[in-house]
Curated annotation (Swiss-Prot):
Family: Belongs to the DeoC/FbaB aldolase family. DeoC type 1 subfamily.
Entry-linked CDD domains: DeoC
Record-given protein name: Deoxyribose-phosphate aldolase
Organism: Halalkalibacterium halodurans (strain ATCC BAA-125 / DSM 18197 / FERM 7344 / JCM 9153 / C-125)
Gene (UniProt): deoC
Alphabetized NCBIfam families for the sequence: deoC (TIGR00126)
Length: 224
């Protein structure tokens, strides 16, 4: 079971003080455990792509408009294009959270579409809605906008805004997006039990810095 879960894990390192040696270790672990991807900040994409060139099943994932989601659609589109040029094959973008709360749904939709269009045919797009900052109504609206924009996944959290994934949020997101969109649980998934709870609730991908601990049946005390 833990081995099949490994293939659902985005092995994640997004800390601002990340070093090159840590990225090398992250990629080595991803190859050893057959994780779905490594998820790194944009500055590390080219290195990760180089390190994983002999492991085509391990994707290179990066983050866009991260962690606040407060850049413009044009900037997010440029970030996406640049990341893909550097070797990213998956992008996790943060929505404009304030615009969602203001019910500026057209702006939020345009924000997501800018990244989807920039990534089209080249990279999967995952939409981070930052569940810990949203009401249930806002979570539903964000998921609906992601579906409408043509995203591939919805994702719970950045790991930088306090709360992380909950099984309740995953179940709600799965209900809204239906069976055909991916749902990624991220933030606070620290052991195999946490991961199984998210998968049982409807998650198809797990974002975690604790990937090795998860597949080894241990527990990690990280924030992501």
């Amino acid at each position: 079971m833990s081995r099949s879960i490994a293939q659902m894990i985005d092995h994640t390192l997004l800390k601002p003080n990340t070093t090159e040696d840590q990225i090398v270790k992250l990629c080595e672990e991803a190859k050893e455990y057959s994780f779905a991807s490594v998820c790194v900040n944009p500055t590390w994409v080219a290195l990760a792509a180089q390190l994983l060139k002999d492991a085509p099943d391990v994707k290179v994932c990066t983050v866009i408009g991260f962690p606040l989601g407060a850049t413009t659609p044009e900037v997010k589109a440029f970030e996406t294009t640049n990341a893909i040029e550097n070797g990213a094959t998956e992008v996790d973008m943060v929505i404009n959270i304030g615009a969602l709360k203001d019910k500026q749904y057209e702006l939020v939709g345009r924000d997501i579409q800018a990244v989807v269009k920039a990534a089209e045919g080249k990279a999967l797009t995952k939409v981070i809605i930052e569940t810990s900052l949203l009401t249930e109504e806002e979570k539903k609206a964000a998921c609906e906008l992601a579906v409408k924009a043509g995203a591939d996944f919805v994702k719970t959290s950045t790991g930088f805004s306090g709360g992380g994934a909950t099984a309740e949020d995953i179940a709600l997101m799965r209900k809204v997006v239906g069976p055909n969109l991916g749902v990624k649980a991220s933030g606070g998934v620290r052991d195999l039990s946490d991961a199984k709870a998210m998968i049982d609730a409807g998650a198809t991908r797990i974002g975690a810095s604790a990937g090795v601990a998860i597949v080894n049946g241990e527990r990690s005390e990280g924030s992501y």
